[in-house]
UniProtKB/Swiss-Prot annotation:
It comes from Synechocystis sp. (strain ATCC 27184 / PCC 6803 / Kazusa). [4Fe-4S] cluster binds at residues 197, 204, 207, 213. The lineage of its organism: Bacteria, Bacillati, Cyanobacteriota, Cyanophyceae, Synechococcales. It catalyses: 2'-deoxyribonucleotide-(2'-deoxyribose 5'-phosphate)-2'-deoxyribonucleotide-DNA = a 3'-end 2'-deoxyribonucleotide-(2,3-dehydro-2,3-deoxyribose 5'-phosphate)-DNA + a 5'-end 5'-phospho-2'-deoxyribonucleoside-DNA + H(+). Pfam families: EndIII_4Fe-2S, HHH, HhH-GPD. PROSITE patterns: ENDONUCLEASE_III_1, ENDONUCLEASE_III_2. This is Endonuclease III. The gene is nth. Binds 1 [4Fe-4S] cluster.
């Protein structure tokens, strides 16, 4: 076996061990955004950019009560939508993207959120992260690995990727993790990033992944 293949096999084994440990640590881990329909999940995920899921969940009840579906959001009052989502940050751009995405859903997809990655990526404000979340949690379709700030940070610290670009990170992780666990991996990594492996002061001394983590061993 070549050194490259041995390295890949070693990374795969570590990724498997990491996920097994995280599943035990966070047995109830799931998407933490509140939603009732695919379009509501799409909107909530757009709002979650540069914002916590907790904050998004405080905003969406009033937003979805006023604008419950794609048609209502697409042709609703822009200023009112901006006011309702103001606390999530970047509210003008988010309102523009939400309305643009919902308008396209209404006009080109018969009011239904598309279930194909290529089609989702044509919606304003939707990149692979948002598309992966919607496909996995609204439709049970595993098209890739969701890469948010936690997944990016922890995957690098754990030595699973050297890439900095989210698309390259996703490709690296897809090679290491079996497809049925693609979204499981992201969700559990996100939980661990929030609880233990923070950006500025990771709690390496308390981390149950420390023995598998090059960054913890180097610190």
């Amino acid at each position: 076996m070549s050194s490259l293949l041995r390295k890949m096999a070693s990374k795969k084994q570590r990724a498997t061990e990491i996920l097994l440990i995280l599943k035990k640590l966070y047995p109830g881990a799931t998407c933490s955004l509140d939603y009732q329909t695919p379009v509501q999940l799409l909107v909530a995920t757009i709002l979650s950019a540069q914002c916590t899921d907790e904050r998004v969940n405080k905003v969406t009840p009033a937003l979805f009560q006023r604008y419950p579906d794609a048609n209502a959001l697409a042709y609703g009052d822009r200023q009112e939508i901006e006011e309702l989502i103001h606390s999530t940050g970047f509210f003008r751009n988010k309102a523009k993207n939400i309305q643009g995405a919902c308008r396209k859903i209404v006009e080109e997809f018969d009011g239904e959120v598309p279930q194909r990655m290529e089609e989702l990526l044509t919606l304003p404000g939707v990149a692979r992260k948002t598309a992966n979340v919607v496909l996995a949690h609204a439709f049970g379709i595993l098209a890739g690995v969701t890469v948010d700030t936690h997944v990016k940070r922890l995957s690098q610290r754990l030595g699973l990727t050297k890439a900095t670009d989210p698309i390259r990170i996703e490709r690296d992780l897809m090679k290491l993790i079996p497809q049925p666990d693609w979204e499981n991996f992201s969700i559990h990594i996100i939980y661990h990033g929030r609880a233990v492996c923070a950006a500025r002061k990771p709690l390496c001394g308390e981390c149950q992944l420390a023995h598998l983590c090059p960054s913890a061993q180097a610190s």
